[in-house]
Amino acid sequence: MTQQTQQPEVNIGLVGHVDHGKTTLVQALSGSWTDQHSEEMKRGISIRLGYADATFRMISNINPPEGYTVDETGPDGEPTETLRTVSFVDAPGHETLMATMLSGAAIMDGAVLVVSATEDVPQAQTEEHLMALDIIGIENVVIAQNKIDLVDRERAIESHNQIQSFVEGTVAEDAPIVPVSAQQAVNIDLLIDAIEREIPTPERDADTSPRLYAARSFDINRPGTTWKNLSGGVIGGSVSRGRLETGAEIELRPGREVDQGGQVEWQPIITDVRSLQAGGESVSEVTPGGLCGVGTGLDPSLTKGDSLAGQIVGEPGTLPPTRESFTMTVELLDRVVGDEAGEVETISTGEPLMLTVGTATTVGAVTSARSGEAEVSLKRPVCAEEGSKIAINRRVGARWRLIGIGTLE
């Protein structure tokens, strides 16, 4: 298998309510591909990113959908044909982690909405995640009706009908609903078939200057490592365009906070690419699509604990501006999604909002609010270009709730 085939080429989000089986489904789809390459970097990414790569394959003498598999050999021991490798982004289903799901959505090309057949539809986060996909504009959706092994036929049909009426009028209205059991690996072939049809690999420009969205960052050194053996900090994310190569000089924006004689300002970080990982392999270059790990020359204390998540990475001098405030056009939802479902009131001056721009989440205070427009001053700046989509969350009770979408002017 060539390195090119092995590299993931598309990012698929797994979204849905907590405990509906997203992580178990990832395990079923990853098949016999386990941690064969347990290098430190990959260990770090898979722990932090909540992601797994899966290679979809075809058994040559069996027609689809039954011929789809994730196994390297068919029933008679014959090798299977590789179709493509995909990266699954496992978005947290817990409501307090909604910001993480939104920042993950920035690097998704499509999504599998996982809904448990054992519970009524919709549960709170199922609804909130679907609304987030709608808002961010992820149109390629497949629905996995999970845990069918735990219900009888009548309940499975009732659940299917509930899902159908729930997605009516949303981005997932025409999405196929595939009944599966992640635990028993039932109908995984049908799910792969639906993903292959509904979530194609998008066309991307690999010949322009590279752009990577950082979704995670970490220190891969074990406690007690001597300074001679220290590895540089690692960034995990997705290349949206161009090629990233080992040895390349890179810039990170908005960078880091620096105290300049009592004045705090944000300065870009310049470093170099020391190593790259994609599809579980060390590679010399990463092309768009899929998730990758970038080993850098940065002090690992700068990258530990996701402290560089939300940065944009590229060639020095090619990145969008760093913004400490911006104006956005605002489109509000009709109602607040979640438990305290109520009408969304207009945004008012002085109110705090949680904003997700790309993979960056920040809090901003509204300095001016007009009809369909708001100016915000950010607590932590973002690097973003005009036209970027912004997920807007408001504090409702003790929680942040999704209330609308902004477009950066």
UniProtKB/Swiss-Prot annotation:
Residues 44-48 are annotated as: G2. Its cofactor is Mg(2+). Keywords: GTP-binding, Hydrolase, Initiation factor, Magnesium, Metal-binding, Nucleotide-binding, Protein biosynthesis. SUPFAM superfamilies: EF-Tu/eEF-1alpha/eIF2-gamma C-terminal domain (SSF50465), P-loop containing nucleoside triphosphate hydrolases (SSF52540), Translation proteins (SSF50447). The keyword Methyltransferase does not apply. Pfam families: eIF2_C, GTP_EFTU, GTP_EFTU_D2. It catalyses: GTP + H2O = GDP + phosphate + H(+). InterPro entries: EFTu-like_2, eIF2G, eIF2g_C, eIF2g_dom_2, eIF2g_GTP-bd, P-loop_NTPase, Small_GTP-bd, T_Tr_GTP-bd_dom. Residues 146-149 are annotated as: G4. Residues 7-203 form the tr-type G domain. Mg(2+) 1 binds at T23, S46. Residues 16-23 are annotated as: G1. Belongs to the TRAFAC class translation factor GTPase superfamily. Classic translation factor GTPase family. EIF2G subfamily. This is Translation initiation factor 2 subunit gamma. It comes from Haloquadratum walsbyi (strain DSM 16790 / HBSQ001). The gene is eif2g.
